[in-house]
Amino acid sequence: LRTKARKDGDDWIITGNKTWITHAARTHVMTVLARSVEGTTDYRGLSMFLAEKTPGTDATPFVDQGLSGGEIEVLGYRGMREYALQFDGMKAPADALLGGEEGQGFKQLMRTVEGARIQTAARAVGVARRAIELAFQYALDRKQFGQSIIRFPRVADKLAKMVTDMVMARELTYAA
């Protein structure tokens, strides 16, 4: 993690990058994990900040000084926009430090990861399901030797394996 936060009077100055911020352009507040404890290289030097920002628009997503970025093209995130951000001296007030104590950011982050992993699994199952639907339709529509290719054992077997794998993934996601 290369993003850093340093204290400057009553503010934190944040520099570095962050990737995978959902709805970053429109949000009023975002979480930022940054190294704030000087001389550390492991998780103990990381702190979490609740950084306020001015909501942007599609044309001008980031208007605050010290903050820029762009949208990331992603698969299966319909209706959710993901961004990569660059912090170039973005200011956050002293009370933006989540929990008020430096070095707790990694622990705070890990408490949120489990839910995010389940959400990612659910999204992947949805993408797989749609891919299977399209594959079935293609196998029905595509003719070879006067018949739909779904009638060929190798094609039917591959489609059956895809369905089996997707159902297993779905059930594991439900159980998570």
Where are these regions (language model features)?
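A generic structural signal for beta-strand entry/edge sites
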Residues: 9-13, 29, 82
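A structural signal for short hydrophobic beta-strand segments in well-ordered beta-sheet cores
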Residues: 3-6
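Glycine-rich beta->alpha junctions and the first turn(s) of the following alpha-helix
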Residues: 65-167
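Short loop segments at secondary-structure junctions
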Residues: 8-10, 35-39, 53-56, 88-95
